[in-house]
A protein has these predicted regions:
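Sec-dependent signal peptide recognition
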Residues: 2-10
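Generic cytosolic/nucleocytoplasmic N-terminal low-complexity/intrinsically disordered segments
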Residues: 1-2, 157
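Aromatic-lined carbohydrate-binding/catalytic grooves of carbohydrate-active enzymes
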Residues: 50, 54-165
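C-terminal motif of bacterial Sec signal peptides marking the signal peptidase cleavage site
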Residues: 15-16
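Second-shell loop/turn segments in exported
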Residues: 34-42, 87-89
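N-terminal hydrophobic targeting/anchoring segments and the immediately downstream early-domain regions
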Residues: 20-36, 67
């Protein structure tokens, strides 16, 4: 048994040292989100400007490929429960949300949008933004996913859980 143990160790070292191939490390998902700089004080022009800057300043080439419209775009839900964008911050309504995501895509970037898994958003909790009350995915998850992905053409949803029930 004592003779087999050193042979096993040598064999294990040879196999482990020769069978590994170096692999390229994938970078993490990188991009810009409106929350840290603007919280709920966002607008259509801020989002467009920031997306343009990602390309202009070379951040896209460095791997920053995502633009996320965070909390603050909410206006209210209509009678059918569909999200209507904030009328002052995004005065073009649903059509404008689609044109913003299309602009982001035209830059070769992915477009993201925000929601909360609960009933209310972080902005309603921390910034006293009344528009975030009832704006979360709770009881609207399928409806919001259809609107955000299919109608507004966003690629991903950033989901928080500030407004949990």
């Amino acid at each position: 048994m004592k003779k087999i143990y050193p042979i096993f160790i040598v064999f294990a070292l040879i196999v482990s040292c020769t069978s590994r191939q170096p692999q390229a490390v994938k970078p993490p998902l990188m991009g810009w989100s409106s929350w840290n700089a603007y919280m709920v004080d966002i607008s259509d022009s801020i989002i467009i400007h920031q997306a343009d800057l990602i390309v202009k300043r070379g951040l896209k080439d460095a791997g920053y490929g995502n633009v996320n419209i965070d909390d603050g775009f909410f206006g209210y839900r209509d009678q059918r429960g569909y999200m209507i964008p904030h009328p002052q911050r995004f005065p073009g309504g649903s059509a404008q949300m689609r044109s913003i995501s299309d602009h982001i895509h035209s830059l070769g970037l992915k477009a993201g949008i925000y929601s909360d898994a609960g009933d209310n958003t972080c902005g309603s909790s921390y910034n006293k933004d009344l528009n975030g009350i009832g704006a979360g995915l709770w009881m609207h998850d399928v409806q919001d996913a259809d609107q955000y992905f299919n109608n507004w053409n966003f690629d991903f949803i950033k989901i928080d859980y500030c407004g949990g029930i």
